[in-house]
Regions:
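Structured, soluble extracytoplasmic/luminal domains of envelope-associated proteins
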Residues: 77-106, 110
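Post-signal peptide N-terminal segment of mature Sec-exported envelope proteins
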Residues: 25-54
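Sec-dependent N-terminal signal peptides
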Residues: 4-13
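Flexible, solvent-exposed short loops/turns enriched in glycine
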Residues: 43-54, 98-118
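N-terminal post-signal-peptidase region of extra-cytosolic proteins
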Residues: 51, 59-71, 96-97, 137-142
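Beta-strand elements of well-folded, non-transmembrane domains
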Residues: 30, 72, 84-88, 143, ...
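Amphipathic, coiled-coil-like alpha-helical scaffolding segments used for oligomerization/assembly
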Residues: 83, 103-152
Length: 152
């Protein structure tokens, strides 16, 4: 009897997941995502048909190295950090419409486009001077317009 209990427990362990603070879980059952995210804590699931995807909902930083065009036609190498956060209640929507690689496919892509559009209106010296704050605000505005309706 004791051996049977251990076997039963061992067979259930692959069907457990822990969702940490600062994350939500999204259940994928037979390839379909549940619409409601799972709160932090212990989650039990059937491992054959179900996966638990973890989505960070805390503030996340990604650093991007790329070349910005300037108004006078110069290229300026820059290393820029982007801070973003996935809205917890929209995590299933983000995974369903964009996929698990949402950071590279959407956040970084939108940033590259917005940064290139904005920096092309400024001189190269402005990118590293007092105009930098204004440039940051314009990039943030463009990114917010695109990302706010998509769960960010």
């Amino acid at each position: 009897m004791r051996m049977l209990s251990w076997l039963l427990l061992a067979s259930m362990l692959p069907g457990c997941a822990v969702i940490n603070q600062g994350e939500v879980g999204v259940i994928r059952r037979w390839g379909k995502l549940d619409e409601q995210p799972v709160a932090p804590g212990l989650v039990f699931f059937e491992p054959v048909s179900t996966q638990v995807l973890r989505v960070p909902v805390r503030l996340t930083t990604v650093t991007v190295d790329f070349t910005l065009p300037s108004k006078e036609g110069l290229n300026v190498d820059a290393q820029i950090s982007i801070l973003y956060r996935v809205e917890a209640e929209k995590a299933p929507q983000v995974l369903g419409t964009i996929g698990e690689n949402y950071e590279e496919e959407l956040v970084v892509a939108v940033f590259r486009s917005a940064a290139a559009d904005v920096s092309a209106h400024f001189f190269a010296r402005d990118l590293y001077s007092s105009e930098r704050g204004r440039i940051e605000k314009e990039i943030k505005k463009l990114m917010t317009e695109v990302l706010s309706g998509r769960g960010f």
